Amino acid sequence: MNAPSGLHRIVIVGGGAGGLELATRLGRTLGRTGRAHITLIEKARTHFWKPHLHEIAAGSIDVHEHATDYLAQSHWNGFRYRVGQMTGLDRAQRLVHVGPVLDEDGRPVTQGYARPYDTLVMAVGSRTNDFGTPGVAEHAIALETPDDAERFHRRLVNACLRAHMQATPLAPGQLNVAIIGAGATGVELAAELHKATRTLVSYNLERIDPERDIRIHLLEAGPRILPALPERIAASATGLLMKLGVKVRAGSRVTAVGAQGVQLAGGERVDAELVVWAAGVKAPAFLAGLDGLETNRINQ
């Protein structure tokens, strides 16, 4: 567990895009040359670039063809990968505490341990922020991980198979998708789903008419979609989405999510069988309890 004597110990917590890139660069420049000992701590076994999660959700790409194995990446690039999730920090002793890892049967893979450091980099990324909206945890899917995206895709396929096989007419909102939040993730998912649903139906699900039966609602609380981008880009994207048949609804704040759809602030209900929450992010909650670190209301 210890670095070679005398080497500067750099510990990076979090193997997202930033953490993995940093570990790789430091490993190549300092780790390989024996000038520092680089350790990346991450609970996942593989890395997937989050901006492509909407493509997994739509079924456009296979996650296993686009994932990077942490063990292999560390071996090739001069750093050490250690599986686990940070649970605490002792700043006085310069120790990162890491919890035990269990397999799918509940058996221990690794025990909890403390990793010493000289330089600590926190690159833990973000988590979904549902702003306390009722029903989000129970009835919506947030695309945080490849598992989330694959779960959404399975539900989408099952919904289409169910609709094709049922003898009764479609219920209100059946096959509809409500995407809450019109940032980059929401906009890209809406466009990708338009193509994906039509491809799926073309596989002999002829009882479903995608133009008639499938509605994609893109709901944004703010005055326009893509609020982080220039207005001209947002306007162009809005026009393109509307041409695809996506129902773009700015100024539509969601107050609750239920089993049959979402409730808007004005009292209107949007019926939907599938709901995706893409409305906001915050830093992981455990940061608020770390030794001596100050955080704001979203744990930054």
Where are these regions (language model features)?
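Short glycine-enriched, charge-decorated loop/helix-capping segments at active-site entrances
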Residues: 53-61, 137-141, 233, 291-293
